[in-house]
Amino acid sequence: MYSAPSACTCLCLHFLLLCFQVQVLVAEENVDFRIHVENQTRARDDVSRKQLRLYQLYSRTSGKHIQVLGRRISARGEDGDKYAQLLVETDTFGSQVRIKGKETEFYLCMNRKGKLVGKPDGTSKECVFIEKVLENNYTALMSAKYSGWYVGFTKKGRPRKGPKTRENQQDVHFMKRYPKGQPELQKPFKYTTVTKRSRRIRPTHPA
């Protein structure tokens, strides 16, 4: 003969159902938040204050620095070369940047063919890159418009086309370096010498 479930069994079933619903809601919120962060990282931010930095980008492959030579881009610049000094503007709260040559005032951009070019106007999304800090402490720059295409150079300092690049290739790995002659950006640690204060001896007066 069939017996009705006890009140305790019903409560347990309701509790398990409630726990399952909570887990589903938390999972959906986590997914939505990740999507929100990814969208914000890829989107332009015209509200936040932009941060401007000056440094060089040392190419792991060529052993030289990225140069913005007007419309031509290379990675053959020596340390301190005027064409290797880059003004880097943070474009969003995430890690999007625009890179401009300080000397030529041309922007580093990647066109639809994946070729690195210099442009006088950097407002196009082709001139925006997503900055990725890798596990080996190098930095990679992925095109914000053409996902999966990276800034890269050959051993001779020639630009590689975006479709032929991958994040794990040494060709797309760079190290940030401050330009020569800018000690205010790389002040060495200075030790301060502290001398022990000598005890003052009071003069004695005859009674």
Curated annotation (Swiss-Prot):
<keyword id="KW-0732">Signal</keyword>
<feature type="compositionally biased region" description="Basic and acidic residues">
    <location>
        <begin position="164"/>
        <end position="174"/>
    </location>
</feature>
<dbReference type="GO" id="GO:0032332">
    <property type="term" value="P:positive regulation of chondrocyte differentiation"/>
</dbReference>
<dbReference type="GO" id="GO:0043410">
    <property type="term" value="P:positive regulation of MAPK cascade"/>
</dbReference>
<feature type="glycosylation site" description="N-linked (GlcNAc...) asparagine">
    <location>
        <position position="39"/>
    </location>
</feature>
<dbReference type="GO" id="GO:0007267">
    <property type="term" value="P:cell-cell signaling"/>
</dbReference>
<keyword id="KW-0325">Glycoprotein</keyword>
<dbReference type="GO" id="GO:0005576">
    <property type="term" value="C:extracellular region"/>
</dbReference>
<dbReference type="GO" id="GO:0045766">
    <property type="term" value="P:positive regulation of angiogenesis"/>
</dbReference>
<dbReference type="GO" id="GO:0005111">
    <property type="term" value="F:type 2 fibroblast growth factor receptor binding"/>
</dbReference>
<feature type="signal peptide">
    <location>
        <begin position="1"/>
        <end position="27"/>
    </location>
</feature>
<protein>
    <recommendedName>
        <fullName>Fibroblast growth factor 18</fullName>
    </recommendedName>
</protein>
<feature type="region of interest" description="Disordered">
    <location>
        <begin position="157"/>
        <end position="186"/>
    </location>
</feature>
<dbReference type="GO" id="GO:0048010">
    <property type="term" value="P:vascular endothelial growth factor receptor signaling pathway"/>
</dbReference>
<dbReference type="GO" id="GO:0007165">
    <property type="term" value="P:signal transduction"/>
</dbReference>
<feature type="glycosylation site" description="N-linked (GlcNAc...) asparagine">
    <location>
        <position position="137"/>
    </location>
</feature>
<dbReference type="InterPro" id="IPR008996">
    <property type="entry name" value="IL1/FGF"/>
</dbReference>
<dbReference type="GO" id="GO:0005615">
    <property type="term" value="C:extracellular space"/>
</dbReference>
<dbReference type="GO" id="GO:0030334">
    <property type="term" value="P:regulation of cell migration"/>
</dbReference>
<dbReference type="GO" id="GO:0005737">
    <property type="term" value="C:cytoplasm"/>
</dbReference>
<dbReference type="GO" id="GO:0005105">
    <property type="term" value="F:type 1 fibroblast growth factor receptor binding"/>
</dbReference>
<keyword id="KW-0339">Growth factor</keyword>
<keyword id="KW-0964">Secreted</keyword>
<dbReference type="GO" id="GO:0022008">
    <property type="term" value="P:neurogenesis"/>
</dbReference>
<dbReference type="Pfam" id="PF00167">
    <property type="entry name" value="FGF"/>
</dbReference>
<dbReference type="GO" id="GO:0001958">
    <property type="term" value="P:endochondral ossification"/>
</dbReference>
<dbReference type="GO" id="GO:0030324">
    <property type="term" value="P:lung development"/>
</dbReference>
<dbReference type="GO" id="GO:0009653">
    <property type="term" value="P:anatomical structure morphogenesis"/>
</dbReference>
<dbReference type="GO" id="GO:0008284">
    <property type="term" value="P:positive regulation of cell population proliferation"/>
</dbReference>
<comment type="similarity">
    <text>Belongs to the heparin-binding growth factors family.</text>
</comment>
<dbReference type="GO" id="GO:0001525">
    <property type="term" value="P:angiogenesis"/>
</dbReference>
<dbReference type="GO" id="GO:0008543">
    <property type="term" value="P:fibroblast growth factor receptor signaling pathway"/>
</dbReference>
<comment type="function">
    <text>Plays an important role in the regulation of cell proliferation, cell differentiation and cell migration. Required for normal ossification and bone development. Stimulates hepatic and intestinal proliferation.</text>
</comment>
<dbReference type="GO" id="GO:0005730">
    <property type="term" value="C:nucleolus"/>
</dbReference>
<dbReference type="GO" id="GO:0001957">
    <property type="term" value="P:intramembranous ossification"/>
</dbReference>
<dbReference type="InterPro" id="IPR002209">
    <property type="entry name" value="Fibroblast_GF_fam"/>
</dbReference>
<dbReference type="GO" id="GO:0070371">
    <property type="term" value="P:ERK1 and ERK2 cascade"/>
</dbReference>
<dbReference type="GO" id="GO:0043406">
    <property type="term" value="P:positive regulation of MAP kinase activity"/>
</dbReference>
<comment type="subunit">
    <text>Interacts with FGFR3 and FGFR4.</text>
</comment>
<dbReference type="GO" id="GO:0008083">
    <property type="term" value="F:growth factor activity"/>
</dbReference>
<dbReference type="GO" id="GO:0043536">
    <property type="term" value="P:positive regulation of blood vessel endothelial cell migration"/>
</dbReference>
<dbReference type="GO" id="GO:0070374">
    <property type="term" value="P:positive regulation of ERK1 and ERK2 cascade"/>
</dbReference>
